[in-house]
Amino acid sequence: MATLSAARCLVVKIGSALLVDQASGALRQDWLTGLAQDVAEIRARGADVILVSSGSIALGRRVLGLGTGALPLEQAQAAAAVGQIRLARAYEEVLAPHKITTAQVLVTLEDSTDRRRYLNTRATLGTLLSLGVTPIVNENDTIATDEIRYGDNDRLAAQVAVMAGADQLVLLSDVDGLYTANPATDPTATRFDRVDEITPEIEAMAGDAVSGLSKGGMKTKLMAARTAMDAGCAMAITEGARPRPLKALMDGAPATWFVPRTDPLAARKHWIAAMKPRGEITVDAGACAALKRGKSLLPAGITEVSGAFGRGDPVIILAPDGTALGRGLTRYTAVEARAIRGHRSAEIEAVLGYPGRAVLIHRDDMVL
């Protein structure tokens, strides 16, 4: 069974119904302060934390006096634009006393489907975490029309977990897990402590959303669980309204854990190995030896580039004698790779005329 105390990189999804009081539209300050304490304690144990937070529309509509009913798309986008500033400031203010630097990252589901944007987002999240920053991620509701209409922050949180290589994802919800039936209407409903596989029978147990401000129901949570599990990330659904919800989960609060069969890095490498390559990159003997020691591929070690590929595309890595070493996702196009082959990373900007990544294929984006 996965436990929160074992997390190496944790993603936490926070819904509008937890963050914003439904009646007044005001921020639940005491609850957020307690969450900040939880985050500080988890980080103190050496784990990275990413928060995926809804709430911009809910906060913005109060400022604009738009009431609590359903909003036309244009008003929802306007409310998101106004509320996003307040949401980011709220997190900054509660985490600053713990000496935690926050960053605002706005994404959409498309950032996980377009390979170039996927790699850029992944690199940004990785850099922020390496610098000790806690990213506050929200979908870009001002432009992401589909996400506003359907409310997919559960799936977005799962995609963020995949991009960050997280090993645990927690969905703070208005229920304490997955039940055999709706516990609000069926007194015989029982909660699952653990799910190892999402079967059609499990999917049939998903109900509809009941919260007034959030739109995600159990169906989107199961979709998130499938995405997370496929990437080797464990996921928990637990009731989030209680004070210090993450501490409560660590102390044994009721939850449903979705447990994967593999770890995030192994799952990612399996995915890369199955992709159809778009080109080939030949490396010299020094680079070949470095790759076998688990290093990333630098431009200096490249001797030949063939094929037409873009940033984020899969390529085959060849040894000097032409044998296949493995596959990886390139951070440069074929044209760029040809230009910088044999050059040191410090020379990339001079060659291309603009700054670039230090490595051509990162070791986490490579399978040998």
UniProtKB/Swiss-Prot annotation:
Stored Pfam families: AA_kinase (PF00696), PUA (PF01472)
Residues binding ATP: K13, S173, D174
Gene Ontology molecular-function annotations: ATP binding; glutamate 5-kinase activity; RNA binding
Database matches in SMART domains: PUA (SM00359)
E.C. designation(s): 2.7.2.11
Function: Catalyzes the transfer of a phosphate group to glutamate to form L-glutamate 5-phosphate.
Similarity remark: Belongs to the glutamate 5-kinase family.
Protein name: Glutamate 5-kinase
